[in-house]
Curated annotation (Swiss-Prot):
The keyword Cell division does not apply. It is found in: Cytoplasm, Cytoskeleton. Keywords: Cytoplasm, Cytoskeleton, GTP-binding, Magnesium, Metal-binding, Microtubule, Nucleotide-binding. It comes from the Eukaryota. It comes from Phytophthora cinnamomi (Cinnamon fungus). The lineage of its organism: Eukaryota, Sar, Stramenopiles, Oomycota, Peronosporales. This is Tubulin beta chain. Belongs to the tubulin family. GTP binds at Q11, E69, S138, G142, T143, G144, N204, N226.
Length: 444
């Protein structure tokens, strides 16, 4: 029933994806060879959301791995769960995109895209009732951003009524990987606004901060960052994989979280995040988890929710707890911090409870927020974009692959429109008409 197809693209997407399958397999009791060694029927009840069952009771991830160079694929294959994936589902080129969006979207990526789509079709056709696609990729590089968005638009053409959910690692303000990140990210956002249904924004700097400040790690590795992301990804899909009380399909997320079709960029958070030494000093209670998941320090993207207002939010609690207490806490949050929620959407926090906690925890919670503060991230990228584009820096790399300057201008204005839309709903109030009348009186 209700299957998902998972696609990972580029170096970043493949590394996050590989970690994600480790976490998910652990939760469903699937070992690195694909055999089931779990201890509960619940692990198998909806295992087909993410796995196909092969001969001999072997579980194979419904995952498609793509990249324009073989390097990352090889390391995934050599990793702990490398033998889990179906060999036909590795699709890679040899040239690499060289951090160039145009190469991923128009030249190198376009040559490889048909073989990726064949695998996507094969996986989609073997589903009973496909509910959608999830894609992990980054927006700053070439493959994940350029080819990732190309794939998203192709899937959109072929499966227009299926949900498209992306986990996108956005360029972070201080941790920069390449100089052309602002170009790649802006061109990608231009595509994601039109073709994706839900975009979970992540970024390395915010993840580093969580590792330093909250988890007290002295030198966090990418493995640690990916682990954080996967904890949240696993939490978001919990209600699809285990019996729960709300949000059991991806479409319901969209319905509950997106008030206007273009505003589908979410912040995600996870709790409990405690450093190894201080776990015994904290109680895992619903109020504690609620307080921690709304904490600005727990957000996995570099935007501060205190600088904006929440349009909507969803919280997925896991573990044995009373639903009544969860509902009370949600009301409590809205009443105490009412200025941080727009007043023209009543009860804008949705909560769901799933009885099965993640490995090694009694209870946990994952948070998805649609906050107007996400515009900070777009503004930052947009400023860097404008600074470079004004001088036409590095443009020849893109025009050389057949792109037009017009596309850059369009992407820039689309991003700026997005920022001003968020700002408009942040400032908007429920009694706008009444307020204008008073202002006019005062003017006279």
């Amino acid at each position: 029933m209700r299957e998902l197809v998972h696609i990972q693209g580029g170096q970043c997407g493949n590394q996050i994806g590989a970690k994600f399958w480790e976490v998910i397999s652990d939760e469903h009791g699937v070992d690195p060879t694909g055999s089931y060694h779990g201890d509960s029927d619940l692990q198998l009840e909806r295992i087909n959301v993410y796995y196909n069952e092969a001969t001999g009771g072997r579980y194979v991830p419904r995952a498609i791995l793509m990249d324009l160079e073989p390097g990352t694929m090889d390391s995934v294959r050599a990793g702990p769960y490398g033998q889990l994936f179906r060999p036909d589902n590795f699709v890679f080129g040899q040239t690499g995109a060289g951090n160039n969006w145009a190469k991923g979207h128009y030249t190198e990526g376009a040559e490889l895209i048909d073989s990726v789509l064949d695998v996507v079709r094969k996986e989609a056709e073997s589903c009973d009732c496909l509910q959608g696609f999830q894609i992990t990729h980054s927006l700053g590089g070439g493959t994940g951003s350029g080819m990732g968005t190309l794939l998203i638009s192709k899937i959109r053409e072929e499966y227009p009524d299926r949900i498209m959910c992306t986990y996108s690692v956005c360029p972070s303000p201080k941790v920069s990987d390449t100089v052309v990140e602002p170009y790649n990210a802006t061109l990608s956002v231009h595509q994601l606004v039109e073709n994706a249904d839900e975009v979970m924004c992540l970024d390395n700097e915010a993840l580093y901060d969580i590792c330093f400040r909250t988890l007290k790690l002295t030198n966090p590795t990418y493995g640690d960052l990916n682990h954080l992301v996967c904890a949240a990804m696993s939490g978001i899909t919990t209600c699809l994989r285990f019996p729960g009380q709300l949000n059991s399909v991806l479409k319901l997320f969209a319905v509950n979280l997106i008030p206007f079709p273009r505003l589908h960029f979410f912040m995600i958070g996870f709790a409990p995040l405690t450093s190894r030494g201080s776990q015994q000093y904290r109680a895992l209670t619903v109020p504690e988890l609620t307080q921690q998941q709304f904490d600005a320090k727990n957000m996995m993207c570099a935007a501060d929710p205190r600088h904006g207002r929440y349009l909507t939010a969803a919280c997925m609690f896991r573990g044995r707890m009373s639903t009544k207490e969860v509902d009370e806490q949600m009301l409590n949050v809205q009443n105490k911090n009412s200025s941080y929620f727009v007043e023209w959407i009543p009860n804008n926090i949705k909560a769901s409870v799933c009885d099965i906690p993640p490995q090694g925890l009694k209870m946990s919670t994952t948070f998805i927020g649609n906050s107007t503060a996400i515009q900070e991230m777009f503004k930052r990228v947009s400023e860097q974009f404008t600074a470079m584009f004004r001088r036409k820096a590095f443009l020849h790399w893109y025009t050389g692959e057949g792109m037009d300057e017009m596309e850059f201008t369009e992407a820039e204005s689309n991003m700026n429109d997005l920022v001003s839309e968020y700002q408009q709903y942040q400032d908007g109030t429920a009694e706008e008409e009444g307020e204008f009348d008073e202002d006019e009186e005062w003017m006279r």
